[in-house]
Amino acid sequence: MIEMNNISYIKGNILHGGNIPRILIHSCNCNGTWGGGIAYQLAVHYPEAEKIYTDICDDFGSELLGKCVLIPSFSDDSLLIGCLFTSVYGGSSHDTKNEILKYTKLSLMQLSLQLENNDSCIDTCLSEYNQLLISNIKHHLKDYKLEMPKINSGIFNVPWEETEKILKELKPMEFTVFSI
């Protein structure tokens, strides 16, 4: 494992985590599709979570930009899925690099507030989904380890170093980044 300030790097499959409380963070679109990259893998492994994600996107669309929504995995009590809404659309229609980076920072700042306040829903527009998370959460949010792949660097085509710079600015948050 390589450590850089508040970021640790691990080689391995992020989907094969242990039984520790963890939030698997990924960047996603507001269009309701987990169709590629890590999002596709999440859809395959956690179809109930994808259904909640799709419902949230159907209800709120682009209002989700810059927000973080925590969704239970429904199959692993120790795993929450942290959806960072960083682009309106996915695939080749994704937003610009600068927009994606801006919304990444905003959504991670919101996640920080959620962890600090043990509140799964800072944004009142998403309050109806709050109860779902509360009924499925087994630990205080601050006790969850933050894990992610190299977000934004796949389908969104943002150089990892630019997202990494944002993560470094978000101390005291600590991230574990997985690569294969």
Curated annotation (Swiss-Prot):
Protein residues bound to substrate: 12-14, 27-29, 34-39, 151-157
Entry-linked PROSITE patterns: MACRO (PS51154)
The enzyme's E.C. designation: 3.1.3.84
GO molecular function, one term: ADP-ribosyl-[dinitrogen reductase] hydrolase activity
Keywords: Hydrolase, Protein phosphatase
Domain Macro: 1-180
Top class in the EC scheme: hydrolase
Matches recorded under Gene3D superfamilies: Leucine Aminopeptidase, subunit E, domain 1
An annotated GO BP: peptidyl-glutamate ADP-deribosylation
Pfam families (alphabetical): Macro
Catalysed reactions, semicolon-separated: ADP-alpha-D-ribose 1''-phosphate + H2O = ADP-D-ribose + phosphate
Annotated family: Belongs to the POA1 family.
Function: Highly specific phosphatase involved in the metabolism of ADP-ribose 1''-phosphate (Appr1p) which is produced as a consequence of tRNA splicing.
Protein name (record): ADP-ribose 1''-phosphate phosphatase
Organism: Vanderwaltozyma polyspora (strain ATCC 22028 / DSM 70294 / BCRC 21397 / CBS 2163 / NBRC 10782 / NRRL Y-8283 / UCD 57-17)
